[in-house]
């Protein structure tokens, strides 16, 4: 009698199915109930992610399209770098338009054109969580709130949280307005945080998630010029740490990235001479980092031939000594510049339009996105209701002044 795959030992079935590409995981789970259950086991997920990370040594990224996310792989071999469109993740009804995507250690925070809701999504596990926004602030169609997703390590599991904040310095207002709030995925509650910042975080500078916390380029509030520090939000204590120094403090454009979910990389662009317009790039990588301390080591220095702009998003391959940065100079196409120790290597067409937003890195994650238990809904406290009402009234007053 012929042996079917269902008759094979569980360990062998795991080994076979762990070779399924990431883009085909949804179809595999729908094939049969036993495969779906097996794919959710911790042993299978660790094996599958391990194979996906090492297979062909590819860098994975997702590009935002109106209703789907395209999965793109980049292979850097030093001779013939290449990109490949691997497929698409689709989870939203056509009525929902993806406005922006932010990647946090395998979780994707999708900001929608619908200003009333956002969604946190784990494409690898096929899990998503819709969150109702308490107050939308989008002057001229631009969401001015800043977002971060992270987690607090508990004894038995990771508790996922969403940080949302607004630090307003509009000249029409008589004084600065700050609103920091956090959403707990376990309790389904919003909490207004008591934070008065002495720092400034620019809306245009991308954040980086590392080991459950989030880092931004930042500077002292009453100073002018470039961001010359970084700052971390600790999702366990629900507090910001102190301003941490960058390796070069003055006169640099700054962009952050993550190296294998273990280190931070900072890209610094600065003038070679005070009175010239010749620039160079430096990339530094952390040797130690936590909420309250950081140390850096220089990784790569690049000249500007051919001239490239400072990318808001970039990647680093530490082993191959390679930098990959996005090039927006040939709208509507989007390219990836690849530069190594020996100089410029290749300019690759990513095959997606800039109108679909810049890609972000993607690393599969085992972080579970819990759904609220319908019979255990907790009501917001009266104190939180008052705090929310006060902030809503103040922000509404500012909106009238600036509109």
UniProtKB/Swiss-Prot annotation:
F-box domain span: 2-47
UniProt xrefs under Pfam families: F-box, FBA_1
Entries under Gene3D superfamilies matching the protein: 1.20.1280.50
Protein name: Putative F-box protein At5g41500
């Amino acid at each position: 009698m012929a042996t079917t795959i269902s008759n094979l030992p569980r360990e062998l079935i795991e080994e076979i199915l762990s070779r399924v590409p990431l883009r085909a995981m949804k179809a595999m789970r729908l094939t049969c109930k036993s495969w779906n259950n097996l794919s959710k086991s911790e042993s299978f997920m660790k094996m599958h992610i391990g194979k996906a990370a090492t297979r062909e040594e590819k860098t994975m990224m997702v590009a935002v399209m109106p209703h789907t996310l395209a999965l793109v792989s980049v292979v850097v071999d030093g001779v013939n770098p290449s990109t490949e469109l691997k497929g698409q993740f689709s989870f939203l009804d056509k009525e929902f338009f993806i406005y922006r995507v932010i990647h946090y250690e395998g979780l994707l925070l999708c900001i929608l054109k619908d200003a009333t809701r956002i969604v946190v999504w784990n494409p690898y596990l096929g899990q998503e969580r819709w969150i109702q926004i308490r107050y939308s602030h989008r002057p001229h169609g631009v969401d001015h709130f800043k977002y971060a997703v992270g987690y607090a390590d508990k004894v038995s599991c990771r508790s996922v949280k969403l940080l949302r904040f607004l630090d307003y310095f509009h000249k029409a207002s008589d004084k600065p307005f700050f609103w920091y709030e956090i959403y707990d995925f376990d309790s389904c509650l919003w909490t207004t945080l008591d934070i008065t910042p002495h720092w400034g975080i620019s809306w245009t500078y991308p954040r980086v998630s590392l080991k459950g916390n989030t880092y931004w380029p930042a500077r002292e509030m009453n100073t002018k010029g470039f961001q010359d520090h970084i700052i971390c939000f600790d999702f366990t204590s629900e507090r910001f740490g102190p301003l941490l120094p960058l390796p070069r403090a003055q006169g640099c454009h700054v962009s952050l990235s993550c190296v294998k979910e273990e280190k931070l990389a900072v890209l610094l662009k600065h003038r070679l001479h005070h009175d010239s317009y010749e620039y160079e790039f430096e990339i530094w990588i952390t040797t130690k980092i936590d909420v309250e301390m950081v140390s850096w080591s220089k990784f790569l220095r690049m000249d500007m031939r051919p001239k490239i702009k400072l990318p808001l998003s970039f990647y680093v391959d530490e082993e191959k000594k390679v930098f990959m940065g996005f090039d927006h100079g040939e709208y509507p196409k989007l390219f990836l510049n690849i530069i190594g120790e020996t100089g410029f290597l290749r300019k690759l067409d990513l095959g997606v339009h800039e109108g679909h937003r810049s890609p972000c890195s993607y690393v599969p994650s085992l972080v579970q996105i819990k759904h609220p238990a319908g019979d255990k809904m907790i009501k917001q406290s009266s104190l939180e209701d008052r705090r929310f009402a006060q902030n809503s009234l103040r922000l509404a007053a500012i909106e009238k002044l600036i509109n």
